[in-house]
From Swiss-Prot:
InterPro entries: PRC-brl_dom, PRC_barrel-like_sf, RimM, RimM_N, RimM_N_sf, Transl_B-barrel_sf. This is Ribosome maturation factor RimM. It is found in: Cytoplasm. GO terms for cellular component: cytoplasm; ribosome. Keywords: Chaperone, Cytoplasm, Ribosome biogenesis, rRNA processing. It comes from Streptococcus pneumoniae serotype 4 (strain ATCC BAA-334 / TIGR4).
Amino acid sequence: MNYFNVGKIVNTQGLQGEMRVLSVTDFAEERFKKGAELVLFDEKDQFVQTVTIASHRKQKNFDIIKFKDMYHINTIEKYKGYSLKVAEEDLNDLDDGEFYYHEIIGLEVYEGDSLVGTIKEILQPGANDVWVVKRKGKRDLLLPYIPPVVLNVDIPSKRVDVEILEGLDDED
């Protein structure tokens, strides 16, 4: 069975079993809602156990979650550094033009026939996502996921076609 990262437990929060999670999912409200089931993996990416979310709230850049039946810091402290994953079968169907992060990261980016680089990360600074493109011999390129820039996404071909608008590439 395939699993996909949705977050990493970075610390505990208070004494009542809450944990700070650095989310790497574009569906945090869905993934961390009360009753949702996730799978814990340790630092060596080994399965630990399935857990059920008892509560979730946002605080600054973190998602604060609590697992069902784990209501004390001593119970959950050992999970610091562990990953939270969702089973592939639990992924939601997406609308046309929507993609999961794991589908986008690693795609090659082209402007015309020229390889620009590879998408290494997705940022969520505000109104739209920003794709971080790793380039050879140059600084990373930040591409907003908006229609004038991203022309086509072809998941099966692992290719993204873009038009780098004036001002986006400060090295040209």
